[in-house]
A protein has these predicted regions:
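Intrinsic-disorder/low-complexity coil detector
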Residues: 48, 96, 118, 174-176, ...
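Surface-exposed, proline-anchored Ser/Thr-rich loop/turn motifs
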Residues: 99-106, 114, 209-225
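Short, solvent-exposed beta-strand/turn "edge" segments of beta-rich domains on protein surfaces
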Residues: 110-118
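Conserved catalytic region of serine esterases and O-acyltransferases that act on ester linkages
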Residues: 1
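Long, low-complexity serine/threonine/glycine- and acidic-rich segments characteristic of extracellular
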Residues: 6-85, 101-104, 108, 122-208
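Extracellular interdomain linker/stem segments of modular secreted and single-pass surface proteins
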Residues: 83-96, 206-214
Length: 225
C-alpha cells in the first residue's frame, strides 16, 4: 500500500454545522501478489509504479498465509518502509498491457455473443513492467465502461490479481450488475505502471432468461488487505 492519506467524508446530512468526518487510511495499492512459502520464507519482486504519492512517508504491507494441509492461517502487517524516490535507471517500456483473453462468462464467448443479464467479465493480462492498480492518479484506473455510460462504468483495480509463478501475468474477474436486455457495447481500459494504456472494445447481447453454464465451483480464503 502507498502511504497513509486523510479521507474526508461527503457529509450528506446538512442538519447541523458540524464538520465533515475525516479519517486516515491506505486506499492506494502499489502491488498485490501471491507466492508459495518455502521453509517459512517467501519473496516478491515488482516494479514500483509511477503513480505513487512520492510522500516519503511510511507505506503498509498486509500479509496473509494459509497451510493448505492443516488449514492454519496467519496474517499480519509491516510498515517500516518509506514510499518515495525515483530510480536512477528508467524503464524503456512504451507498450501497453497485452490483453491475452477477454470474455463474458466463459472462453466460448465471441464478440457480439449472447449472455445473461448478469454476465461475468474476465480478462487475462500480461505486461513486462506490471499492471497499474494504484488508483492514485486520475485517468489511469482499470475500467470497464458499458454503452459509454457513467452509471455503467466500473473501476476494476481491486478485482485484479497476479497469477503465481508467472511474471507479469494476471487476471481480472468482475460480476457485472444486472443489465437491460438488448445489444450493448463495452470498452475495457488497462494501464501499466509506466502509464502505457491498452483498450479493447467488444459487443454483446443481453438475453433475459438466458443462464450461463456452471463449469466448476472453487472456494478460496479471503485475502487480508
Amino acid at each position: 500500500k502507498d502511504s497513509k492519506v486523510t479521507v474526508t467524508c461527503l457529509k450528506n446530512s446538512n442538519k447541523d454545522d458540524s464538520p465533515a468526518f475525516t479519517f486516515t487510511d491506505y486506499p492506494n495499492t502499489i502491488f498485490i501478489g501471491n507466492d508459495s512459502v518455502r521453509n517459512g520464507k517467501f519473496s516478491f519482486t515488482f516494479t514500483v509504479p509511477k503513480d505513487i504519492s512520492y510522500s516519503n512517508l511510511q507505506g503498509k504491507m498486509n500479509l496473509y498465509a494459509v497451510d493448505t494441509e492443516s488449514g492454519n492461517e496467519a496474517q499480519g502487517n509491516f510498515d517500516n518502509f518509506i514510499v518515495g524516490g525515483t530510480s536512477d535507471t528508467s524503464e524503456t517500456d512504451t507498450i501497453g498491457p497485452e490483453i491475452r483473453a477477454l470474455y463474458l462468462n466463459d472462453t466460448t464467448f465471441v464478440d457480439g455473443g449472447q449472455v445473461n443479464t448478469t454476465p461475468y467479465f474476465v480478462a487475462e493480462l500480461w505486461d513486462k513492467s506490471g499492471v497499474n492498480i494504484t488508483g492514485s492518479s486520475v485517468g489511469h484506473d482499470m475500467m470497464l465502461v458499458i454503452d459509454e455510460s457513467t452509471v455503467l462504468s466500473y473501476n476494476l483495480n481491486s478485482y485484479y490479481e497476479l497469477l503465481p509463478g508467472e511474471d507479469g501475468t494476471g487476471i481480472v474477474k468482475f460480476p457485472i450488475p444486472a443489465l437491460e436486455p438488448g445489444k450493448h457495447t463495452a470498452e475495457f481500459w488497462v494501464w501499466d505502471i509506466l502509464n502505457n494504456s491498452t483498450v479493447r472494445t467488444f459487443t454483446f447481447e443481453v438475453v433475459e432468461g438466458l443462464k450461463p453454464f456452471l463449469f466448476d465451483v472453487i472456494a478460496t480464503p479471503g485475502i487480508a488487505r
